[in-house]
Structure formats: C-alpha cells, structure tokens
Regions:
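N-terminal amphipathic alpha-helix/helix-capping segment at the start of soluble metabolic enzymes
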Residues: 1-15, 72, 263-265
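Glycine-rich, proline-tolerant flexible connector loops at the mouths of alpha/beta enzymes
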Residues: 14-27, 45-67, 231-241
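Conserved beta-strand positions in the central sheet of alpha/beta enzyme cores
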Residues: 15, 46-48, 86, 106, ...
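Active-site mouth loops of central-metabolism enzymes
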Residues: 16-29, 57-65, 83-88, 107-109, ...
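A short alpha/beta connector and helix-capping loop motif
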Residues: 27-31, 35, 95, 100-110, ...
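Alpha-helix-loop-beta-strand connector modules within alpha/beta enzyme cores
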Residues: 33-41, 60-86, 121-127, 177-187, ...
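Catalytic beta/alpha-barrel core
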Residues: 65-66, 80-94, 103-116, 127-138, ...
Length: 265
C-alpha cells in the first residue's frame, strides 16, 4: 500500500480503532462496524490498534495481551476485511517485526525526534506516520520527515495531536495543519488524543470526549487530509485511553456530518 491509495477519492481518509488490542473478538467486531460505515460513506479506511501500549503513566497500567498475540490479531483483521493496518512502534528493534503484520508504522509523539526509530521505520518500506510532539512547532516536523525521506522512504504522513498547554491540558492550533501541509506530506488530525488531559494526580490520563465532534469538524473545515480517532464499544471499560475515546455507536453519525462538511469545501 502507498499513500496514494488513501487519497484516491476527494474524501478525507480515516485511521480508527481501539487504543490497544484488548482481545481478538472485540477487535474484529470494531473493525467490522467501521468497515461497514466507511464503505457506506466512501471513506478510505485504515484500522488502528496498538499491539503494545508502552507509554503509560503507571507500572500497573495495561500495556497489551502480548506482542505476538496482538500482532496476529492485527494480521487477522487485515486478511478478514482486506484493509490496511496501522500500529505504533516504540524502538528501532520493533520496526521490522511489526512491518510483517501491518501497512503503516506510527511514531508516537513523544518519540518523533528519535533518529534511530525513524530510520528503522523508513527502512521497512512501509508508510511512516509521524505524530507531532506536543512540544514541537509544526514547522519543526520537517526535520523528522526529512530523516525518513533521507533514509530512502518518501511515504510519510504527519499527524497533529495537540500542543501542551500548561501542565494538564492540550490545545490544537489549527494554523499548524496548513503549515505542515506545505512540507509536502499528508496531514492527519488526531482528534481523540488532542482532547487528552495528561498528568493527572491519579496517574490516569483524563479527557474531554464531549468535544470530539467540535475538534473533528474544525479539522475538516481547515482542510486536513485525514482523521485519526480511537473508538471503543464502551469507553468506560476500555483498558487504555477510555477517557478520551469516541463511543463506537456515535461514529457513523459523526462521520456523516464530516463528509457533508468536506463536500462543501
């Protein structure tokens, strides 16, 4: 798969799924629901699921069901629904392993400056989606992208996921989306992570899911190429990032509104 496959229509494309793979049956159900919705609306779709959630606040936080088991779930989704898959990697040693199962390797925001990680991802030949660090300016993302390109891979996407605002909040500066687009790469808005409220005293990240629709609509209005959203059948029992996820039952209604906005641009 190449980026051109995601841009084959005038619509935005979507990266969506649970934060982390919690089990095969649930992941398959979520994928099935989203495939039916995106097919109906004509939205190019990539299933998102982390096989390991390494960035957690506490040692006792859930990180996954085991790398091999979770990667096999991702491969099953890929084969069952004939859709591309995106997953996060956290070290250079994970790149080649994950690339055997997925189509897009995602670089977490906190790791977007890690040269060895970016180069290892580039060398797989997969699409590399780099999330903008909460501490970086939009323009500074060209240096992260350049590392991948100079390593021989021009299949790069950039993702806006909010900027640190004080100690326990993030904001989206929508001016950064067209600024990053001038770098020559597709730009994605990570709607749900942009609504996180990090560094809470309980050691569990908070969120403002009631603003998901607002942030997503604004992203489409400014011309973002794709959207990233984490979704779950019941966010209240999700094992990671439930506080800022979109309930799966709300996805079709939201995407329908977003497609209408896109059509008038």
């Amino acid at each position: 798969m190449t980026i051109s496959d995601l841009r084959k229509t005038d619509n935005f494309f979507l990266l969506a799924g649970p934060c982390v793979i919690e089990g095969e049956e649930m992941a398959l159900r979520i994928a099935d629901r989203i495939v039916k919705i995106t097919d109906k609306l004509g939205i190019p779709y990539v299933f998102k699921g982390s096989y390991r959630n390494a960035n957690r606040s506490r040692l006792d936080s859930f990180t996954g069901i085991g790398d091999e088991k979770a990667l096999k779930v991702l491969r099953k989704i890929r084969e069952t629904f004939d859709i591309p898959i995106v997953t996060d990697i956290h070290s250079a040693g994970e790149a080649a392993m994950a690339a055997e199962y997925v189509d897009v390797l995602q670089i977490p925001a906190f790791l977007c400056r890690q040269t060895d990680l970016l180069v290892a991802a580039a060398h797989t030949g997969k699409i590399v989606n780099i999330k903008k660090g909460q501490f970086l300016s939009p323009g500074a993302m060209r240096f992260a992208a350049d590392k991948v390109v100079e390593a021989g891979n021009d299949q790069v996407m950039l993702t806006e996921r909010g900027t640190t605002f004080g100690y326990q909040d993030l904001i989206v500066d929508y001016r950064g989306i067209p600024e990053m687009q001038t770098l020559g790469f597709p730009v994605i808005l990570d709607v749900t992570h942009s609504l996180q409220q990090p560094n809470q005293t309980a050691g569990v990240t908070g969120g403002m899911p009631q603003l998901i629709e607002t942030v997503a609509k604004a992203g489409i209005a400014v011309g973002v190429d794709g959207l990233f959203m984490e979704t779950h059948e019941d966010p209240s029992v999700a094992k990671s990032d439930g506080a800022n996820m979109l309930k799966l039952d709300l996805l079709e209604g939201l995407l329908t509104k977003l497609v209408r906005i896109r059509q008038v641009l």
